[in-house]
C-alpha cells in the first residue's frame, strides 16, 4: 500500500516577533492515529528536514489520545527530530499528502517550491492533497499541469479570518489564509468558529481548524477506499 506524506513546519517564531510557535501537535497526532487504525503507513516531511518545534499554545489542548501518539518513540524520532527533507522523498511512493498546521506554517509552507512539486506530482498521479487549519497555506501556490493555481475554482476551507481574530493573532501573521485562498480563485467555505468542519472537492480534502484533523483523516480514508 502506498503511504501518506505528513508535512510539518520548522518555524520557531512568528517571524521577527520573538514568540514561540511551531506545529499544533494534535493536528498531526489525531490524523496519524486514524491512519494507523486504517493500516495506512505515513512518513513525515518538513521544508528543511530534521527538527520540528511544537506550538506551546497547542499543548493546552492535548488529550489522552494525542499523548498516546506523542509518547511513541517512532513519532518522536520520525516526526519531531528527524523529519525528511523534500529531497529525500519520491512522490510516487504516496497516495496523499497532508499539511498539518500551527501558525509556524505561515512562514515556511507557502513558498516552498520543493513541497509544491511533490504535492503536484501526487495529485497528477491521482492522489489526494489534504490539509487542516493553517496547513491550507501549503496549498496556496501549488500549480496544476497548465500552470494555474490548483485551488482556483475549488471548494476548500482552513483557519478563517474570524478564527484568527479570536485567537488574537491577526496582527502577528504575514497574511490571512481565507483572503489568500480567495485571491487565487478558491471558494473558501467556512462554518462556525472552532467547530469541526471538513470539505472535499475532488482530490482536495481540507479541514477548517484544529478540531477538524480527525475528520480530514476519516474523509481521506473513505476516499482512498472508493
Question: What is each residue range found by the language model?
Answer:
Residues 128:
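Active-site cofactor/cluster-binding pocket
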Residues 133-135:
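Catalytic nucleophile serine of serine hydrolases
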Amino acid at each position: 500500500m502506498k503511504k501518506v506524506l505528513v508535512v510539518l513546519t520548522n518555524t520557531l517564531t512568528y517571524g521577527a516577533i520573538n514568540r514561540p510557535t511551531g506545529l499544533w501537535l494534535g493536528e498531526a497526532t489525531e490524523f496519524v492515529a486514524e491512519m494507523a487504525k486504517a493500516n495506512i503507513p505515513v512518513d513525515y516531511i518538513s521544508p528543511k528536514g530534521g527538527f520540528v518545534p511544537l506550538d506551546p499554545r497547542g499543548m493546552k489542548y492535548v488529550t489522552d489520545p494525542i499523548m498516546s501518539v506523542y509518547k511513541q518513540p517512532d513519532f518522536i524520532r520520525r516526526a519531531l527530530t528527524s523529519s525528511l527533507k523534500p529531497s529525500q522523498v519520491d512522490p510516487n511512493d504516496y497516495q496523499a499528502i497532508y499539511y498539518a498546521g500551527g501558525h509556524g506554517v505561515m512562514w515556511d509552507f507557502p513558498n516552498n517550491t520543493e513541497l509544491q512539486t511533490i504535492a503536484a506530482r501526487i495529485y497528477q498521479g491521482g492522489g489526494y492533497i489534504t490539509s487542516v487549519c493553517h496547513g491550507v497555506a501549503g496549498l496556496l501556490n501549488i500549480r496544476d499541469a497548465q500552470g494555474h493555481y490548483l485551488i482556483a475554482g475549488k471548494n476548500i476551507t482552513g483557519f478563517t479570518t474570524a478564527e484568527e481574530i479570536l485567537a488574537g493573532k491577526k496582527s502577528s501573521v504575514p497574511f490571512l489564509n481565507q483572503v489568500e485562498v480567495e485571491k487565487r480563485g478558491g471558494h473558501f467555505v467556512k462554518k462556525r468558529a472552532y467547530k469541526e468542519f471538513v470539505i472535499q472537492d475532488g482530490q482536495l480534502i481540507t479541514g477548517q481548524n484544529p478540531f477538524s484533523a480527525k475528520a480530514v483523516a476519516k474523509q481521506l480514508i473513505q476516499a482512498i477506499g472508493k
